[in-house]
Amino acid sequence: LRSKQHEFNGVESLKRVFGSAQGKQNVPAKFVYLNDIDSEPVTADGFLTWYDARERHPTRSEYRMYFPTTSVSEKAVKGDLLVIGRRPDGSVLVVVAQGDSTVASQVRWLFGAQNFDGTGYLIRENPETEQDRIAFASRAILEAIGVDVETSQDAMLEDMLRRFHGAFPSTREFSSYARSTLTGVHHGDNGDGVLMAWMEREESLFRTLERHLIADRLVAGFGHDVDAFIAFSLSVQNRRKSRVGLALENHLEHLFLQRGVRHSRTGVTENRSKPDFLFPGVQQYHDFAFDAKRLTVLGVKSTCKDRWRQVLAEADRVEQKHLLTLESAISSNQTDEMRAKKLQLVLPAQLHRTFLPAQQAWLATIE
């Protein structure tokens, strides 16, 4: 990915994307670098230059693509995954994902390149026409690389504004509301499908309400108060991040309650740890006459990154711990480490196919 010349050789694959250059073509580009450690991607704006280095040669062509030095190119190293995407407006999105990372696995899955060995270039034309991608997982990955995905339930906006008095309700209240709008989904149905349906509905309803409330605030304006604008922007981001995790816990708790599954949510264990769910309950956990083999601890994280290790220290009496997540295509390096640490990964069945075949046999479902 990195070269002193700052150029990629224009093999036939790139010509299929950018065509035959007449002179130097400067293409607006957004550069994005992703890894599993940083909470936000590194981004930069610039241009790619596509040209024929032998344009004046009567019989030979030598196409090249020049890329500038940016904060993204400075992080890229050999072995990283590179994705070059042409947008409908002609601009380009250049994504670099750290090699062997979970986010690289996710980007591979998103573009149908899980079996790509990294040699040369793989061209995927019109990937949006592929219908085998899971909406919830795809949206999360696309937003991570800076692509906004609109999802809305505009027909429900008036009802939400009336019910919640033009403000954001508590996460528990909103989760309950989202479930109530899905009359065709019953808690007795397949648990994996039920959880995904509830989460997808809540996500689309929340984005609909959020878009309206944010628009109202922007219309009101901030005057010359830059700090107020920054604070508002941060509050939007933080609300999105915290809400998804709480929504997942809310829907799981409702599923357990409706099915009569005994549990404690955020019960206190050693060192004031608060595992998301303890089965059959925190009282049994603290009763040392109760067989530890009958205890189960379940951590819940909408996304993992390195935070999955927090679950390991939340219940000393339980040797084999469980973690439920909605994160797709977690890398083999991460799942191998989870297995070694005696952490069982649990995902809705629909997300299992985002993983490699060798990983899928180990994954557990909700049902």
Regions found by a protein language model. Name each.
Residues 1-95:
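Long, contiguous, compositionally biased segments that the model treats as domain-scale units
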Residues 44-60, 76-92, 99, 103, ...:
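Charged, structured surface patches that assemble and position nucleic-acid processing machinery
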Residues 74, 205, 215, 225, ...:
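Short, glycine/acidic-rich beta->alpha junctions
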Residues 90-105, 203-216:
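Accessory beta->alpha helical hairpin/"wing" motif in late/C-terminal subdomains of nucleic-acid enzymes
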Residues 157-246:
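Interdomain/boundary linker segments immediately adjacent to catalytic/signaling cores
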Residues 250-253, 257-258, 263-367:
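Catalytic core segments in nucleotide and nucleic-acid processing enzymes
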